[in-house]
Amino acid sequence: MDCLCIVTTKKYRYQDEDTPPLEHSPAHLPNQANSPPVIVNTDTLEAPGYELQVNGTEGEMEYEEITLERGNSGLGFSIAGGTDNPHIGDDPSIFITKIIPGGAAAQDGRLRVNDSILFVNEVDVREVTHSAAVEALKEAGSIVRLYVMRRKPPAEKVMEIKLIKGPKGLGFSIAGGVGNQHIPGDNSIYVTKIIEGGAAHKDGRLQIGDKILAVNSVGLEDVMHEDAVAALKNTYDVVYLKVAKPSNAYLSDSYAPPDITTSYSQHLDNEISHSSYLGTDYPTAMTPTSPRRYSPVAKDLLGEEDIPREPRRIVIHRGSTGLGFNIVGGEDGEGIFISFILAGGPADLSGELRKGDQILSVNGVDLRNASHEQAAIALKNAGQTVTIIAQYKPEEYSRFEAKIHDLREQLMNSSLGSGTASLRSNPKRGFYIRALFDYDKTKDCGFLSQALSFRFGDVLHVIDAGDEEWWQARRVHSDSETDDIGFIPSKRRVERREWSRLKAKDWGSSSGSQGREDSVLSYETVTQMEVHYARPIIILGPTKDRANDDLLSEFPDKFGSCVPHTTRPKREYEIDGRDYHFVSSREKMEKDIQAHKFIEAGQYNSHLYGTSVQSVREVAEQGKHCILDVSANAVRRLQAAHLHPIAIFIRPRSLENVLEINKRITEEQARKAFDRATKLEQEFTECFSAIVEGDSFEEIYHKVKRVIEDLSGPYIWVPARERL
């Protein structure tokens, strides 16, 4: 009887609870986080007498320096190998065995499965134990330089294919694109299905696994999936495809990433890795044996696929990303449809749901005629294990998308001055707003390719606000406008959806709304002005004191502090105007406070203390940013005094995040700091110039400095009197 020998390999995943704290990094490194590939001279990498090996072969090698910025989930890849446990044969190299979807490495796009790590920053890991390599990566800091080696891929055969559209269109399906990689680490667009009887099938040259480089004159390298689909759809009857044919060595598994080893099982690696990066401990193995394992959403938009049309029962376990899909619909009984599936999320990994599915029920709750709000509540309150009855209805979903498309066309026509009877006349054309929330177009429906994503604090020039749901806008950088133009959700749309969310939250809580009146923030109107002073700095949230101290000590020529006022008697060693402005009359200081000459004041031991507007102005007019340790209320008082501050809120992601950033405080102190920060954000969000987050103080401090640099002026955006 044959024996089956299973060999396991050590692994380490750089994310979630295993993510180490970020260490100090050289000041110049953050600017290199997105640097282009650098081919490293092999002489600098090879020690005398050391023979480099990759996968036990002597193939032609290439070298690359890759700089990654550690994200919320760490570096986003898995490794195996080492002198104590070689991954392939007797090769002691440290190999990349998995690229985590959505992680830092996947977003950068250059690191590949089977790359061999030679150096981590300046640490040589070519011939070390597995634990030593893990330690080198843990101690590498927030900005990590990897020197990697890989075998050069065989040259692809590029050819041009002419297709003539038939009744089934072009007759093939695609997958891939930026943010939706079909093969981890590769943004290319791949052919995943040839429709029998279609144009591609009749021509015979296009094959599964082919890479589409261009459609007519439109390049498809490093584009989003939606853009590739649009390029293929927006063609006439005759279409020219520029196609790269893969090497024969890889044709055995067109869906798998090129694997140049014979002893490494991609299937095994996926099977033992999935549960750990989802942050779950479900006993059910999620073995991704389907060829769709690298394709989060079914992308059969160019031809019909044989997909069961009967209702299906799907069980999904809620993960750290929720259920991992978005829904649309719920108006006029049109049904609830899945519009987006998050790559790497529970729905994606189950392989059971697809865009275009109608959700018929959730845990027995009938959603066939539910409103969008009712469906959202049912999904939110479904618990950890969710049973969904879904039915694939591409025709109905296509009609829903067609309605969105018609709206988009109307908006476009309106913006060009043609107008339509269904759109209101446009009372507001050409105004500027500042976003008070983050918007990710991929999480919304309908406008995936033409919507404009933005972050909190971004300034947008609204070109056309004639529609109630979508405004046409252009992003503004500094004192110039970019070519980034698209559609953003209107104030009404944002507030309606947020109220629905808050209503669902209150409905699902045991205490109900308790009379709470949550304010919904969307945008504020802004106007541009020129300033001739250094803007004061107000940092709020956990670690603000450390950030203030570091700015003053690191850049004494750029930052300063003002001298406070007090009615306390002067002590012998104190100097008036240096330590304090000593006010002899309490009555006078009280009058000045009532006259709004102080941005903040209080009483301690029967003496008044305060920071005057004039003290801040003196520092600002000296060309130094005045660092202020005040409350958020001071922001509005400074604005009223025409000293527009840069207010930066340091937002903790969680209680654990507070403890990780400041290891010297107790859990109780961290909980109080987290609660204070949460309340501060709820009450003063509109006062913040920017919101920063980070896994370490070093990361936060770097972002704080970048915000100050970006918002220093001389041209700045300030709140306008006009209300939306």
Curated annotation (Swiss-Prot):
The chain residues annotated with the modification Phosphoserine are S73, S142, S295, S415, S418, S422, S425, S449, S480, S606, S654
Task: Describe the processing and modification events after translation.
Answer: Palmitoylated. Palmitoylation is required for targeting to postsynaptic density, plasma membrane and synapses. Palmitoylation by ZDHHC2 occurs when the synaptic activity decreases and induces DLG4 synaptic clustering. Palmitoylation by ZDHHC15 regulates trafficking to the postsynaptic density and function in synaptogenesis. Palmitoylation may play a role in glutamate receptor GRIA1 synapse clustering. Depalmitoylated by ABHD17A and ABHD17B and to a lesser extent by ABHD17C, ABHD12, ABHD13, LYPLA1 and LYPLA2. Ubiquitinated by MDM2 in response to NMDA receptor activation, leading to proteasome-mediated degradation of DLG4 which is required for AMPA receptor endocytosis.
The annotated topology with respect to the bilayer is: Lipid-anchor
User: GO terms for CC?
Assistant: AMPA glutamate receptor complex; cell junction; cell periphery; cell-cell junction; cerebellar mossy fiber; cortical cytoskeleton; cytoplasm; cytosol
Q: What SUPFAM superfamilies does this protein map onto?
A: P-loop containing nucleoside triphosphate hydrolases, PDZ domain-like, SH3-domain
Positions carrying Phosphothreonine: T420
Entry's Gene Ontology BP terms: AMPA glutamate receptor clustering; cell-cell adhesion; cellular response to potassium ion; cerebral cortex development; chemical synaptic transmission; dendritic spine morphogenesis; dendritic spine organization; establishment of protein localization
Where's the Guanylate kinase-like domain? 534-709
Q: Name the InterPro entries for this protein.
A: DLG1-4_PDZ_assoc (IPR019583), DLG1-like (IPR016313), DLG1_PEST_dom (IPR019590), GK/Ca_channel_bsu (IPR008145), Guanylate_kin-like_dom (IPR008144), Guanylate_kinase_CS (IPR020590), P-loop_NTPase (IPR027417), PDZ (IPR001478)
Q: Which residues does the UniProt record annotate as the domain PDZ?
A: 65-151, 160-246, 313-393
Q: Where is the SH3 domain?
A: 428-498
What is an example of a GO molecular function annotated in this UniProt entry?
kinesin binding
- Where is this chain's protein located in or outside the cell? Cell membrane; Postsynaptic density; Synapse; Cytoplasm
Q: Where is the lipid attached (S-palmitoyl cysteine)?
A: C3, C5
Provide this UniProt record's keywords sorted from A to Z: Cell membrane, Cell projection, Cytoplasm, Lipoprotein, Membrane, Palmitate, Phosphoprotein, Repeat, SH3 domain, Synapse, Ubl conjugation
Phosphotyrosine PTM sites in chain numbering: Y240, Y580, Y715
Q: List, alphabetically, the PROSITE patterns matched.
A: GUANYLATE_KINASE_1, GUANYLATE_KINASE_2, PDZ, SH3
What happens when you mutate C5S? Loss of palmitoylation and targeting to postsynaptic density
Return the annotated region ranges for Disordered.
15-35
State whether it acts alone or in a complex, and with which partners, per the record: Interacts through its PDZ domains with ANO2 and NETO1. Interacts with KCNJ4. Interacts through its first two PDZ domains with GRIN2A, GRIN2B, GRIN2C and GRIN2D. Interacts with ERBB4. Interacts with KCNA1, KCNA2, KCNA3 and KCNA4. Interacts with LRRC4 and LRRC4B. Interacts with SYNGAP1. Interacts with ASIC3. Interacts with SEMA4C. Interacts with CXADR. Interacts with KCND2. Interacts (via first PDZ domain) with CRIPT. Interacts through its first PDZ domain with GRIK2 and KCNA4. Interacts through its second PDZ domain with the PDZ domain of NOS1 or the C-terminus of CAPON.
Family statement: Belongs to the MAGUK family.
Described by its record, this protein's role is as follows: Postsynaptic scaffolding protein that plays a critical role in synaptogenesis and synaptic plasticity by providing a platform for the postsynaptic clustering of crucial synaptic proteins. Interacts with the cytoplasmic tail of NMDA receptor subunits and shaker-type potassium channels. Required for synaptic plasticity associated with NMDA receptor signaling. Overexpression or depletion of DLG4 changes the ratio of excitatory to inhibitory synapses in hippocampal neurons. May reduce the amplitude of ASIC3 acid-evoked currents by retaining the channel intracellularly.
Q: What is this protein called?
A: Disks large homolog 4
The organism encoding this protein is Rattus norvegicus
